[in-house]
């Protein structure tokens, strides 16, 4: 069926339900007017339905007249009448059934509208709070929990001032420089308060326009927090500030508002010796708080798990595995919140490395550890990344929470096992054969098998990755030009396995200690993920 025919069928189906085609929107969607009638209701409300001509997107449904009996703020209904009846991304529209899908959306919208009219779903106001709290953006880069007065940096982006609240000006300034923002010497008086109550808008008198409105609203949520807010506003007034920014930390979200002091009015009132609290009439401006702290950036995609924030981790080898792996570790919080990520590699990036390395042509002939640290600092300015461009056998790594061997070199891996015995946890990650499989082994205590143990077991045919011998494939010419060929996708597989096991480690999951991911589908997996014992022949574990 053609797109035009499908649209015609949908419009005809809506026509049978009392809707009329009235034209197109500026972006080409089809507009229909009719009435949205809740189930078991006698009459409906005038509404507009906008249909995506491709039927990939949910129909937009907007009430043309908001019932006067509804409160100022209700769940799922915007100030312009826009109705949120389904969360985008929660359903997939069947583009081959446009009539059925579009009518189902209309029916769902009618059900939600009916619940709104019945005063149901009020609890959803807390989840939708930011839909009712529009304002100037303020960015928060705070890792500590300290309350009270905070530092606020004012920066310019394309001539527009932006506010950045921070507990570490150097760290935040680095982030702003990476964005190309110009840091000014201006500041805004800022206070941080905490509440145990989730915010939700009032169903009347919304949005708040004065300090009195804010305090009345907060009284319904947390009277103790209301008192703290009022104290900070009056403190700013005593400090002769032009305004004050109040940031409120609630259990699941951070929000705020700015208070603008009317100095001329205050002077006039002081002349009249007006002893009433003049702060209640001050104008307020809602602030949309955007978190940019490193803890949040790492935790956002893993809300119920620990991240690598605060850990001291070293990655030995910044080559085809270590480059991708270190990138993933930083995204998981490595090097942040007091932690440190150390990269060790004495080698330089050569042209033959670029095809399967995280770094690229601009880093040609650069030391891999230094170039990788520079790249990670560009991506995560708040992270502490240390580069050691030396042979790891001559490096002083200090006390570590986790040592990762990403070199893929057996002899060096054995040396690391002997030089960094338990209780230092060690993770070895490597690629077997020409990208046949990727493997990783975690050792957290003395009774665990080490990388050398696995070498002895493999010689006896135990704990191997595949049932057949590993293919011996080399490419290149001459002794110095030979190499094992495999694409960058194999390196990413290995790095992903290493990142997965690192996150398991920080969350207290140490088993299975040996994990294998088969890449070559022509081969058969020999050893399922398991916990190999110490090998009786290992000189490191039996000395």
From Swiss-Prot:
Residues 160-305 are annotated as: Linker domain. It is an enzyme of class 2 (transferase). Induction: Part of a CBASS operon consisting of capV-cdnA-cap2-cap3. Keywords: Antiviral defense, Isopeptide bond, Transferase. CDD domains: E1_enzyme_family. Residues 306-543 are annotated as: Adenylation plus E1-like domain. InterPro entries: Prok-E2_B_dom (IPR032701), ThiF/MoeB/HesA (IPR045886), ThiF_NAD_FAD-bd (IPR000594), Ubiquitin-activating_enz (IPR035985). It comes from the Bacteria. Its EC number is 2.3.2.-. GO terms for molecular function: transferase activity; tRNA threonylcarbamoyladenosine dehydratase; ubiquitin-like modifier activating enzyme activity. The keyword Transferase applies. Residues 1-159 are annotated as: E2-like domain. Gene3D superfamilies: NAD(P)-binding Rossmann-like Domain (3.40.50.720). One of its GO terms (biological process) is defense response to virus. Has an N-terminal E2-like domain, a linker and a C-terminal adenylation plus E1-like domain, dimerizes via the E1-like domain. In the C-terminal section; belongs to the HesA/MoeB/ThiF family. Forms a Cap2-CdnA complex. A Cap2 dimer is bound on either side by a CdnA monomer. CD-NTase priming component of a CBASS antiviral system. CBASS (cyclic oligonucleotide-based antiphage signaling system) provides immunity against bacteriophages. The CD-NTase protein (CdnA) synthesizes cyclic nucleotides in response to infection; these serve as specific second messenger signals. The signals activate a diverse range of effectors, leading to bacterial cell death and thus abortive phage infection. A type II-A(GA) CBASS system. Acts as a protein transferase, conjugating CdnA, the CD-NTase, to unidentified target(s) in the cell probably via an E1-E2 ubiquitin transferase-like mechanism. This primes CdnA, upon phage infection CdnA activates and makes cyclic nucleotides. Protein conjugation requires ATP. This is ATP-dependent ubiquitin transferase-like protein Cap2. It comes from Pseudomonas aeruginosa (strain BWHPSA011 / Pa011).
